[in-house]
């Protein structure tokens, strides 16, 4: 579902096709993703912290008393510190990337320069670039099986460019057990319906990371006066002559929906993070780096 605009400039059918048409900008999205990934890698290298791109989340400092056979001498030679390769990351993992491309994701208010869908695509390509340098298998449900190739980012871009899906979520039944699953969506639906879609993942012993893509207008509901609201997926319309009167109730329901999803994720040992389209993607990527390295799946694999 998308929020309102003062005047509806395009018919519903054109709204539904907007996000798919934006994929013509895929070369620009690839360029942006590479720039973000390279900036992060350069920053990690400059700070001399473990996880500098080639070994994303893979190393930690050596502690006295630990076996020297686990020291990674190549990584340690880069600076004055000594690093161990984490045992759990010696086994390649599969990370499933799930960017929502449904009609509501095309929404972009005047408070942002990019739609939710394009924000999700750039995030997907950036994560793929970083994960590929880590040697992880990367996959997209219904589009690309787990793979680890040098051109995986380009393959993902091509797959997304030639794919249009009205559904917010893919077929999760194809996801392999003991994987990481990163789901990028606006999650604008009844929470119980979303949870029903996600239930299949709870049986697969995966660790899911839900990234809620949000437009600034969806957070604050800045609308006033006569406003028409359109749901681009159901085509349902609502006209308000005094939109500001809806703000309090809207914000209450909007944040209650989010909190219910946060609580569900917490019970599963999953993570939930909000990524607004007017903010840099780096914060979201740092969040994923921390939560994936601290996840129960990560710790179980160390046993």
Name each model-derived stretch.
Residues 2-48, 56, 61-69, 75, ...:
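Exposed, interaction-prone extracellular/peripheral surfaces
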């Amino acid at each position: 579902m998308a929020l309102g605009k003062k005047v509806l400039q395009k018919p519903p059918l054109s709204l539904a096709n907007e996000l798919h048409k934006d994929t013509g900008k895929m070369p620009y999205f690839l360029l942006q993703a590479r720039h973000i990934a390279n900036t992060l890698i350069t920053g990690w290298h400059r700070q001399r912290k473990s996880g500098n791109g080639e070994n994303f989340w893979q190393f930690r400092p050596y502690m006295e008393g630990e076996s020297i056979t686990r020291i990674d001498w190549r990584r340690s030679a880069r600076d004055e510190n000594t690093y161990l390769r984490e045992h759990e990351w010696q086994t390649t993992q599969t990370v499933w990337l799930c960017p929502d491309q449904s009609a509501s994701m095309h929404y972009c208010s005047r408070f942002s320069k990019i739609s939710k869908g394009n924000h999700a695509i750039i995030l997907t390509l950036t994560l793929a670039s970083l994960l590929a340098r880590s040697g992880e298998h990367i996959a997209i449900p219904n589009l690309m099986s787990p793979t680890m190739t040098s051109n995986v980012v380009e393959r993902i871009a091509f797959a997304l460019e030639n794919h249009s899906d009205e559904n917010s979520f893919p077929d999760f039944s194809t996801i392999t057990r003991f994987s990481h699953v990163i789901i990028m969506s606006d999650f604008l639906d009844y929470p119980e319906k979303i949870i029903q879609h996600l239930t299949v993942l709870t049986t697969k012993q995966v660790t899911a990371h839900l990234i809620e893509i949000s437009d600034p207008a969806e957070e604050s509901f800045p609308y006033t006066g006569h406003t028409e609201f359109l749901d681009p997926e159901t085509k349902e319309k609502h006209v308000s002559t005094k939109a500001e009167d809806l703000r309090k109730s809207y914000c209450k329901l909007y944040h209650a929906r989010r909190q219910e999803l946060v609580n569900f994720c917490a019970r599963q040992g999953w993570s939930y993070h909000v990524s607004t389209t007017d903010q840099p993607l780096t914060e979201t990527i740092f969040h994923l780096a921390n939560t994936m390295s601290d996840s129960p799946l990560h710790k179980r694999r160390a046993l």
